[in-house]
Design a protein with these regions (language model features):
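Structured mid-to-C-terminal alpha-helical surface segments
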Residues: 1-48, 58-258
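Catalytic metal-binding/acid-base residues of hydrolase active sites
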Residues: 55
């Protein structure tokens, strides 16, 4: 059954209230799901690997053409996508690629969103098939995804490479959350290989040796403490997680690659 814009808005508000989450963030997630379901329903399904956040990795160089076709797929959900801008990703050191700035439109609901599509990422050992549970529907869609070890390896590499210059607190939060839920599922040998492969891809092969010293400096840095407090104020889901908590988790992850 197709939901009306008013029904979607109402359900989003209820979920936000129950989970103490920002309704606008949930609306972006819902609209991202509408795009991902179009990916799952398209002929390009096997060419895309979901990485997390708003980043999608495209294989075999089909990013621009396929994305333009995917956005026009009609699933009968009342959602359309308007591409406002297509640009090269220039502000991230981790990956080159294309950024799509678009509006997801459902009746009078207009939700701005960005989707980053990169190529050439290293996944160790390989992508996995993932059943993505939808936010408002009691069903899942099947997509290819990064495996846990590669996700953690990339986040750890980012934290170490940026060091005291890091302004992206989300990686610390993600490491804390992923370890809290999935630590027992981590294959340490795969994690080590994924970290080495990521460092090689990003030309930071010496990070493993430098990791303990970098971690100690990051742990004691007053500016990063302040940035984390700002992140907590902006995102209620992080309010109960201290800087010491995220550093403990990050150091734990770092110890697993030694």
């Amino acid at each position: 059954m197709q939901l009306t814009p008013e029904q979607v808005k109402g359900r989003i508000k209820n979920v936000a209230k129950e989970n103490k989450t920002d309704a606008r963030t949930l609306m972006r997630i819902y609209m991202m799901e509408r795009f991902l379901e179009r990916v799952a329903s398209s002929q390009y399904k096997d060419n895309f690997i979901i990485k997390g956040g708003m980043l999608v990795t495209a294989m075999v160089g089909v990013a621009l053409r396929s994305t333009m076709e995917i956005k026009d797929i009609d699933l009968g959900d009342g959602v359309t996508f308007e591409v406002k801008e297509v640009s090269n990703i220039m502000d991230e050191m981790e990956y080159p690629g294309i950024r799509f700035t678009m509006n997801a439109v459902m009746g009078k609901l207009v939700t701005p969103m960005k989707i980053d599509i990169s190529t050439g990422d290293v996944i160790t050992p390989r992508a996995i098939e993932y059943n993505y549970k939808l936010l408002l529907d009691d069903r899942s869609i099947s997509l290819y995804s990064y495996n846990l070890e590669t996700i953690l390896a990339e986040k750890l590499q980012t934290v170490l490479a940026r060091g005291l210059l890091n302004t992206r607190m989300r990686d610390f939060y993600d490491i804390k959350t992923l370890l809290s839920i999935y630590e027992q599922d981590i294959d340490v040998d795969v994690l080590k290989k994924a970290f080495e492969a990521t460092c090689k891809k990003r030309s930071t092969e010496n990070l493993k040796e430098k990791a303990p010293k970098i971690m100690a400096a990051v742990s004691d840095d007053a500016q990063l403490h302040t940035l984390w407090k700002s992140y907590q104020k902006k995102y209620p889901y992080a309010a109960d997680i201290s800087y010491e908590d995220i550093m403990e988790s990050t150091m734990l992850l770092g110890s697993k690659i030694q």
